[in-house]
Each structure stands twice: as structure tokens, then as C-alpha cells.
Amino acid sequence: MAGHLKLVGVPLKVRRLHTAVCHYRGRTGAEHLWLTRHLKDPFVKAAKVESYRCRSAFKLLEMNEKHQILRPGLRVLDCGAAPGAWSQVAVQRVNATGADSSSPVGFVLGVDLLHIFPLAGATFLCPADVTDPRTFQKILELLPSRRADVILSDMAPNATGIRDLDHDKLISLCLTLVDMAVDILHPGGTLLCKTWAGSKSHLLQKRLTQEFQSTRVVKPEASRKESSEVYLLATQYRGGKGTRRP
């Protein structure tokens, strides 16, 4: 699968809010309710003020503040990176642009099925399916020394509306990342992935416990309270000494 390397910085503009307002008319009651909540969301407003591409940036900012996931000099693989908000945070925290001359310079690689607008300090591989073996090989080629210190994932499958099916798909995506870690994640590294609470959550947690020394469930304030979304933070990767899926 062909990917596109994006290195040039462009002004960061939040377009979603403007687009939503322009198309407010002609929506259903449920859509009006969602849009009203969206426009009142303090994290949406803060993202616009601080030039983050979407509100999810504040999830990573909070988790990083509490758990020190990112630091200057680290190599980061951001899976499900579009529209690029997590990559923005990662670029800042690992000093990927070299803005701080007194600190090590890190690296950020973002991968997504969707197009991502260029961001200074980040390399984007898109459109690309992280589960495709060809994408995997391209990731290895792009990562410095073919390794990442941190794997971030805010990925989610296209929703079917069938909760159990969507949950199963997301768990499968997360397990794919754990499988990839054997060849990508540096020993001692970190994996942070989004999941939805459900019947198979324990399978993912069990696998992470086998592969990492420490695993915890995190629910940042920016995650909506009514959402089943949680993040699994696994640290101190054992280096593939756990049990790989058949």
C-alpha cells in the first residue's frame, strides 16, 4: 500500500467547528443534540484556542502529565493518527522539531487510513492500514533504527452500531498492535491504546500483562463520561517474551 511522507509544516486550523455550524440546518433531532453538545464542549473550545486539531489532544496531554509517557528524544509510533492531534502533542513532548537545542531530538511517525495534513516535526504514512503487512514494512523502514520507544493508538473501527461487534473489532486492532510490538517496540517501551469496555476486555488486559511489567486502565477527563472509552497504559515492555497470538 502506497504511503505518503509528510514533513512540511502548515498553519494548524480547526475546520470542524466551522463546518458543523455551516451545516446545522436540515439535521435530525439526534444530530442537533450532538452538535449542541459539541459546540458547548470546553475541550472543543480549548482545542480551537490552543490550535490543536481536535479535542482528543487533551486526553493525551492529561495522561502524559500523570504518567510521563513522552519525553525528549523518544521515537513515537502514532496509530490512528488522523487528524493529527496526538501527533501534535507527541512532537512537542519528544522535541521532534529540535526546538529545544538543549534536549535530545525525538521522532514521530503517524499512520492512518485517512489523509492527514502535514505537521512540522512529524512523518505521516497515509492512507495506510496499520494491519497491512506492506504498511508494517514501511513503518520499519521509517522508524529510526527500526524501533519505537512508544506506541500510541487512538484507533477505532468504523462503527456498525452493534456494540458487541464494534468492541470485538477494537480489541482485535489492539491485539494486532501487541503482536507488532515484538518487531517494533524497544524493550522497556510503552504502549497506550484506546479500547471500549466489553466482554473481551480481559483478553487484551491479560495479553498486556504477559508482555509488559505494568498495566493500568486510564480514563482521562476529556473522555466523555457517558462513553465506554478507556485507555490501557502498558509500560516496561518485556521484549516479546510473553505469549504471541497463533
Curated annotation (Swiss-Prot):
Q: Which GO terms describe its cellular component?
A: mitochondrial matrix; mitochondrion; nucleolus
Alphabetic keyword roster: Methyltransferase, Mitochondrion, rRNA processing, S-adenosyl-L-methionine, Transferase, Transit peptide
User: What protein am I looking at?
Assistant: rRNA methyltransferase 2, mitochondrial
Record organism: Mus musculus (Mouse)
Q: Which gene encodes it?
A: Mrm2
**Residues given in the record as S-adenosyl-L-methionine binding sites:** 83-86, 112, 129-130, 154
Task: Tell me which Gene Ontology terms the entry assigns under biological process.
Answer: mitochondrial large ribosomal subunit assembly; rRNA methylation; rRNA processing
**What Gene Ontology molecular function terms does this protein carry?**
rRNA (uridine-2'-O-)-methyltransferase activity
EC number of the protein: 2.1.1.-
Looking up PANTHER family in the UniProt record yields: RIBOSOMAL RNA METHYLTRANSFERASE, RRNA METHYLTRANSFERASE 2, MITOCHONDRIAL
Q: Where is the transit peptide?
A: 1-24
